[in-house]
Amino acid sequence: MNPNQKIITIGSVSLTIATICFLMQIAILVTTVTLHFKQYECDSPANKQVMPCEPIIIERNITEIVYLTNTTIEKEICPKLVEYRNWSKPQCKITGFAPFSKDNSIRLSAGGDIWVTREPYVSCDPGKCYQFALGQGTTLDNKHSNDTIHDRTPHRTLLMNELGVPFHLGTRQVCIAWSSSSCHDGKAWLHVCVTGYDKNATASFIYDGRLVDSIGSWSQNILRTQESECVCINGTCTVVMTDGSASGRADTKILFIEEGKIVHISPLSGSAQHVEECSCYPRYPGVRCICRDNWKGSNRPVVDINVKDYSIDSSYVCSGLVGDTPRNNDRSSSSYCRNPNNEKGTHGVKGWAFDDGNDVWMGRTISEDSRSGYETFKVIGGWSTPNSKLQINRQVIVDSDNRSGYSGIFSVEGKSCINRCFYVELIRGREQETRVWWTSNSIVVFCGTSGTYGTGSWPDGADINLMPI
């Protein structure tokens, strides 16, 4: 090869290598620009929000490092867009209930600073469940705990902790309240907090940590609400509130709330005669509530709420095995779906049930006369057949020798269905246990399961003789 040919060959090879390097640099540049401007896909439309990181809100806080030759590129991961919950999935098919959580608050109070509470409940945001209760403004081992049997004082506040975390001194006080309800619409928490004088109380509506709206007493007789979770569908939250006699005719209204603002109020309609302390659950496209008739019936009222047109209907659970306390024994109790049964209707206790096709799952105290023991079961035809009494899948949650109290429902959305869970309030102290001067509670929580399960009893478990007086 002569010198000229060598020069041409070397030049050709050099040009080829230079071309390849140039193309590689272009590819790297294009990749860099593409990944850099990919972040603009993260921009949210006006009606979207960025999922907050807890406890400090940091958006786009995850960085993935990608190495290309000697170039380092930072690729931002888009934050998850948050939308309103619609609860459109079907209800989970269950065989019964399995243990989920127990906070042991009273036992822990024997040696620690734990709040005095009552009226607990559970509610979940899309990622986590929380327990709520109405605190008495004092811990148990504190002289202020004397005489905390009273329901309504200006010191009571709504407490909120992760489920399973007892209400210790670091617990957040969400609002001032002696009656409350809370729910998460998919974007933020709504808290309904009632406080004030019996004859002129105020309900405050707190959304995303801000006071947005309020309403005053409309019947001047202890404005009160659910003492369990409200329900939000597509941004509209519903809460049942009652003002009026606890043992006679009262004025019940259903409030529709959007981001903390009252947008509509519907009066109770249908055949229910008295409605208090409703336990509500999403039944897409509406909301269904099982409540307490404190006047005429030991069968539980049903309130059906249409979220789209604000219409309301009401009736009673058809099951002849009724859910309130006090009640007749199962042989003589009755319910015919439309009206109160007029069987030991005066007084009562907050409770729950939910429909399962034509059947009904329900919980109640084991005692017919007192808040002792707790059981769950399914009544075949209990949702559709008047006075149905065929009971299956009975479980004991708290044995009959131990105290129970209020109970309520909450719903948890899974990947393919919506599960129903419930909590039981385990009351201790006055009036029954007169060695001490306080009244407080712990809770136990169960959730629906499609699996098998065993037996047991999950009472509060504190030895009253070891407790502060």
UniProtKB/Swiss-Prot annotation:
<feature type="binding site">
    <location>
        <position position="118"/>
    </location>
    <ligand>
        <name>substrate</name>
    </ligand>
</feature>
<feature type="transmembrane region" description="Helical">
    <location>
        <begin position="10"/>
        <end position="30"/>
    </location>
</feature>
<feature type="glycosylation site" description="N-linked (GlcNAc...) asparagine; by host">
    <location>
        <position position="234"/>
    </location>
</feature>
<feature type="disulfide bond">
    <location>
        <begin position="232"/>
        <end position="237"/>
    </location>
</feature>
<dbReference type="GO" id="GO:0005975">
    <property type="term" value="P:carbohydrate metabolic process"/>
</dbReference>
<keyword id="KW-0326">Glycosidase</keyword>
<feature type="binding site">
    <location>
        <position position="152"/>
    </location>
    <ligand>
        <name>substrate</name>
    </ligand>
</feature>
<comment type="subunit">
    <text>Homotetramer.</text>
</comment>
<dbReference type="GO" id="GO:0020002">
    <property type="term" value="C:host cell plasma membrane"/>
</dbReference>
<dbReference type="InterPro" id="IPR001860">
    <property type="entry name" value="Glyco_hydro_34"/>
</dbReference>
<comment type="similarity">
    <text>Belongs to the glycosyl hydrolase 34 family.</text>
</comment>
<feature type="glycosylation site" description="N-linked (GlcNAc...) asparagine; by host">
    <location>
        <position position="200"/>
    </location>
</feature>
<dbReference type="InterPro" id="IPR036278">
    <property type="entry name" value="Sialidase_sf"/>
</dbReference>
<feature type="binding site">
    <location>
        <position position="371"/>
    </location>
    <ligand>
        <name>substrate</name>
    </ligand>
</feature>
<feature type="disulfide bond">
    <location>
        <begin position="183"/>
        <end position="230"/>
    </location>
</feature>
<feature type="binding site">
    <location>
        <position position="293"/>
    </location>
    <ligand>
        <name>Ca(2+)</name>
    </ligand>
</feature>
<dbReference type="GO" id="GO:0004308">
    <property type="term" value="F:exo-alpha-sialidase activity"/>
</dbReference>
<feature type="active site" description="Proton donor/acceptor">
    <location>
        <position position="151"/>
    </location>
</feature>
<keyword id="KW-1032">Host cell membrane</keyword>
<keyword id="KW-1015">Disulfide bond</keyword>
<feature type="topological domain" description="Intravirion">
    <location>
        <begin position="1"/>
        <end position="9"/>
    </location>
</feature>
<keyword id="KW-0812">Transmembrane</keyword>
<feature type="active site" description="Nucleophile">
    <location>
        <position position="406"/>
    </location>
</feature>
<keyword id="KW-0325">Glycoprotein</keyword>
<feature type="topological domain" description="Virion surface">
    <location>
        <begin position="31"/>
        <end position="469"/>
    </location>
</feature>
<feature type="glycosylation site" description="N-linked (GlcNAc...) asparagine; by host">
    <location>
        <position position="70"/>
    </location>
</feature>
<dbReference type="GO" id="GO:0046761">
    <property type="term" value="P:viral budding from plasma membrane"/>
</dbReference>
<dbReference type="Pfam" id="PF00064">
    <property type="entry name" value="Neur"/>
</dbReference>
<comment type="function">
    <text>Catalyzes the removal of terminal sialic acid residues from viral and cellular glycoconjugates. Cleaves off the terminal sialic acids on the glycosylated HA during virus budding to facilitate virus release. Additionally helps virus spread through the circulation by further removing sialic acids from the cell surface. These cleavages prevent self-aggregation and ensure the efficient spread of the progeny virus from cell to cell. Otherwise, infection would be limited to one round of replication.</text>
</comment>
<feature type="disulfide bond">
    <location>
        <begin position="278"/>
        <end position="291"/>
    </location>
</feature>
<feature type="disulfide bond">
    <location>
        <begin position="92"/>
        <end position="417"/>
    </location>
</feature>
<feature type="region of interest" description="Involved in apical transport and lipid raft association">
    <location>
        <begin position="11"/>
        <end position="33"/>
    </location>
</feature>
<keyword id="KW-0106">Calcium</keyword>
<keyword id="KW-0946">Virion</keyword>
<keyword id="KW-1043">Host membrane</keyword>
<keyword id="KW-1133">Transmembrane helix</keyword>
<keyword id="KW-0472">Membrane</keyword>
<feature type="glycosylation site" description="N-linked (GlcNAc...) asparagine; by host">
    <location>
        <position position="402"/>
    </location>
</feature>
<keyword id="KW-0735">Signal-anchor</keyword>
<feature type="binding site">
    <location>
        <begin position="276"/>
        <end position="277"/>
    </location>
    <ligand>
        <name>substrate</name>
    </ligand>
</feature>
<feature type="binding site">
    <location>
        <position position="292"/>
    </location>
    <ligand>
        <name>substrate</name>
    </ligand>
</feature>
<feature type="glycosylation site" description="N-linked (GlcNAc...) asparagine; by host">
    <location>
        <position position="86"/>
    </location>
</feature>
